[in-house]
Amino acid sequence: MKTIRRSAILLVLVLFCTPLLSGQDLSSYRKFSLGTSLTALSKQVGQDPLRADLIHQSPALIQQMTYWPIETAPSSTRAESVSQVLFSFYNGELYKISVTYDQQATEGLTEDDMVDAISARYGTPTRLVPEIALPTSDEYAPSSKVIARWEDAGTSVNLFRTNSLNTFGLAVYSKKVDAQADAAIIESAKLERQQAPQKEIDRQKGEADKLEAARLKNVKAFRF
């Protein structure tokens, strides 16, 4: 019975991961493609682009949007293997797709099972790297280990497993834009540290001005 269930889950993964087998396009996952605008992708997942999370605004605009396929999939469709998809945008364009697979849907599957399922979509892995961690700036680091990697000159696809939650995930990203985003995030953090003292001064002044305005108003209106 367990063997049948495991085979069924693998079939679901393969079906979801195999829109085309010829001329594998690493820059897409299911119906989502790197380089898509925030506005266009929001329409695809039925969300308001204004609800995207603002991560950093300077020196580059970094935003994220979370999509839960299980919540939106009709009950009549085949089982959904993905728990969550995190979309990352650089200056309004999708540069990274971070997928978290549902624990129940992947229960009992080995790392080789997952590699085989993903390979049905992206071809033979270019590297099997069980001891390599994802970059420290990645959402899943440092507790994730890459199992297999598919890549070309512009795109990297990484199948990983989290140590803490023991779940599988997939990260699809543009190498060039991911590097630009990482640099922008580091620079933004640096600017925030530099501006923190002045921001605190401004905050305290704003609170003091607000309190003084309330005091003056109440002085005029107070009756004992």
Where are these regions (language model features)?
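Bacterial N-terminal signal peptides that target proteins for export
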Residues: 1-9
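Bacterial N-terminal signal peptides
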Residues: 9-19
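Non-cytosolic coordination micro-motifs
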Residues: 24-61, 101-224
